[in-house]
Amino acid sequence: MTELDINEIEAYNSNKMGWIELITGCMFAGKTEEFIRRLRVLSYAKKRVLAFKPSIDNRYSVENIISHSGSKLDSYLVHSSDEIKQIIEKENQIQQVDVIGIDEVQFFDEQVVELIEQLANQGIIVIVNGLDKDFRCLPFKNVDKLLVTAEFVTKLRARCHLCGNFANRSQKIVNGQPALWDSPLILVDGKESYEARCRNCFIVPKKEV
């Protein structure tokens, strides 16, 4: 099952049960687009929704979460999971928060996983998205744990930048060439710095000798 239908939303209304939804995959797979869509559906269903994005990701906007295709959603720009917690506590004093969205969860500190669990246990729906693996094809922090704990996991694929086949890997490009193994892990520059690649076209990063 990849997403929730109206019956499950109604069950939430009556039982006040929280859960975790994880949207993951490689670069350019449409994760943010799907993330925004789900939060909008719940907002239309009269749920109070708050969205958060990491301060490191300011490619398109500081105030909005924006997908590569241009879809946007109002959000808080935050530096840590503790800041997320503080904002939620403050907003709950105004009106109870029903849904929390966290964009690019792999860029947050590792305490964010514990916070997400706490929120779900409090009856809040938590929807997060993030890369499942880095450009070396190693598991990304936070997402690796959420793959285990989330009630709902959607793994999206892109199309290979080179051959057009299904892609589930992110190739980091530096100066027109695949990045070396020791290249910095985090580089948020969109399509100019990354390409979606399939298994056949992906080039395993080389280690400097």
Swiss-Prot record:
Reactions catalysed according to its record: thymidine + ATP = dTMP + ADP + H(+)
GO MF annotation list: ATP binding; thymidine kinase activity; zinc ion binding
Keyword GTP-binding found: no
GO cellular component: a single term: cytosol
Subcellular location(s) of the protein: Cytoplasm
GO biological process: DNA biosynthetic process; thymidine metabolic process
InterPro entries: P-loop_NTPase, Thymidine_kinase, Thymidine_kinase_CS
Top-rank lineage group of the source organism: Bacteria
Residues making up the signal peptide according to the UniProt record: none
Protein's UniProt keywords contain Nucleotide-binding: yes
Family the entry assigns: Belongs to the thymidine kinase family.
Protein name (database record): Thymidine kinase
Taxonomic placement: Bacteria, Bacillati, Mycoplasmatota, Mollicutes, Mycoplasmataceae
Gene for this chain: tdk
